[in-house]
């Protein structure tokens, strides 16, 4: 077949080979898809930048919060107020969590409530102690529970309840007396205006349990410490005491309570005598842990005597060590929160912190020793008291 014949008869061309697919018209992306895609891109970009800025903002905030820890401290403001009706022999003082009132417990059993900012007297209450003389006193860390030892060898446990209530302005009684700084009183409680168009009422009540004989009758208690424990239905109150003869006792008072409320049965006291103190010991202070497994006695010369009372039926004198330099007496003693740190204040103005640590090869009865772990800046005068925050 010649070329001319092909042109003359196109149907003669073979069609047995593969054929090309038909050409399709070009596609165009819809405008709505392009708009959505652009919005998604911008959203992701802006969101990513926002996350980065948020992280940097958190870093700046944390740096601002932490920086004061490294920049030292300074006093922003301070104020002083003389407490009206305050006695010279105060056993302890308690400030409420809002720093509105201060409660003072005096040796004669009176409990005075003052406005903290101005010192004005709000109310005077009283523990009814009769003719007994207070010779020893202890309180829990938050100050709500107290133990009072007397000259006849008895002990009474009490409570100081700082009660807070939030009121509507319409529930506030009339005729209140202005105290200053936005506080008012009706001579029973303090009323403070707070946010949300509300008023906070703070009042104090006290009560005292019946006396419990601890030492032989007529032998005064000279040192005391007190802790709370146990379960709600069977609360326990443990205390360690030293009487005028030098005898030291670990006691536990247990009361049965009904789950439906009220007290069932009579409070019972179980006491254990601890090994006698060395002859001539002049006790400055005494401490006990909440578990009643350790007791610490400090004499006025600066020697600490530690008792291991984990086995209550067989307590031991575990350690005797000096915690102040020779010739320097101990003026204050107490626990920090957790009862692992013991703060010791000295007549030379020193403030040191001790821990009870386990050490192999120690010559103590239980393998633990008291170790000075922190030495704080010395004060100009002797340290006579300190207060630990409950938080």
What residue ranges belong to the model's regions?
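Short loop/turn segments immediately following beta-strands, especially the blade-tip
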Residues: 68, 118-119, 159-174, 251-264, ...
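Loop/turn residues immediately N-terminal
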Residues: 108-111, 152-155, 245-248, 293, ...
